[in-house]
UniProtKB/Swiss-Prot annotation:
Gene3D superfamilies: alpha/beta hydrolase (3.40.50.1820). The gene is tesA. GO terms for molecular function: fatty acyl-CoA hydrolase activity. It is an enzyme of class 3 (hydrolase). Pfam families: Thioesterase (PF00975). This is Thioesterase TesA. GO terms for biological process: lipid biosynthetic process. Involved in the synthesis of both phthiocerol dimycocerosates (PDIMs) and phenolic glycolipids (PGLs), which are structurally related lipids non-covalently bound to the outer cell wall layer of M.tuberculosis and are important virulence factors. The keyword Nucleus does not apply. The active site is at S104, D208, H236. Its EC number is 3.1.2.-.
Length: 261
């Protein structure tokens, strides 16, 4: 079962049907899934289906996306992490440990949320970062100060898109949340001494030009534990063609940690 956590709706957790069963216990490890910018939780249903019932999966649904109209716009990665952690956090740390998976922008958010779980005394299994540059190594930093119109102009210049498309209000409303997320991504950083104690395992496509291997290697500086990088064939969304191998690696590392604990 893939559970979906919707910020802005306290206590609302919905389920998507999965091939596994729902025999989770209080000690079952939980994997929180943080989607990419512009992606919603339902995008990760196929990803979730590859896991066994030995791991509980909870995907985070961001404000301002489908079924989330009217919620506050993203202002920063740390602010969104605060909001999500406040909803995730039970009154006391659970018996089961937690792990985090984030793709693209979701990798930054997963890191920030993991820091909050760590400070609150939770047992962290690992942070799994997919196709996401390490803090301080994010490209296109100049766009962090762009207005909405500046962002739309940049899209026209970079893609050759007809600017008349942006005269359509419905089209603007549809595209601006993703562009605003890109602006937030470009402005994200954190102090160099900020680290998690759990291992960080990173994954990247060999043809990814948005987050390259060189951009991801500095994630090793963000953990006092183990670090590894694994390269798959594919582009920024390499995971779509490598679901079984990716999930197998994540599940093996998660359950190995639980066996040792």
């Amino acid at each position: 079962m893939l559970h979906v956590l919707r910020p802005g709706y306290a206590g609302a957790v919905n389920g998507h049907s999965n091939n596994g069963n729902d025999d989770e216990t209080s000690t079952t490890p939980t994997l929180y899934i943080f989607p990419h910018a512009g992606g919603d939780a339902t995008y990760y249903v196929p990803f979730s289906r590859e896991f066994s019932a030995d791991i509980k999966r909870i995907a985070v649904h961001y404000p301002g996306q489908r079924d989330g109209y009217g919620l506050p716009a993203l202002t920063s990665i740390p602010a969104l992490a605060d909001e999500i952690f406040a909803i995730m956090k039970p009154s006391a740390p659970p018996e089961g440990a937690v792990a985090f998976f984030g793709h693209s922008m979701g990798g930054m958010l997963a890191f920030e949320v993991a820091l909050r779980f760590q400070s609150a005394g939770y047992r962290l299994i690992a942070l799994f970062v997919s196709a996401c540059s390490a803090p301080g190594y994010i490209r296109y930093k100049q766009i962090k100060d762009f207005s909405d119109n500046d962002m739309l102009d940049l899209v026209v210049r970079m893609t050759g898109m007809n600017p008349d498309f942006f005269e359509d209000e419905e089209f603007r409303v549809g595209v601006l949340p993703t562009l605003r997320a890109a602006r937030i991504i470009a402005g994200y950083n954190c102090p160099p001494e900020t680290t998690v104690s759990c291992p960080i395992y990173t994954y990247i496509g060999d043809k990814d030009w948005i987050a390259t291997q060189e951009d991801m290697k500095p994630w090793r500086e963000r953990t006092t534990g183990a670090f590894a990088i694994r390269v798959f064939p594919g582009d920024h969304f390499y995971l779509n063609g490598n679901l079984s191998e990716l999930v197998c690696d994540i599940e093996d590392k998660t359950l190995e940690w639980c066996d040792r604990a």
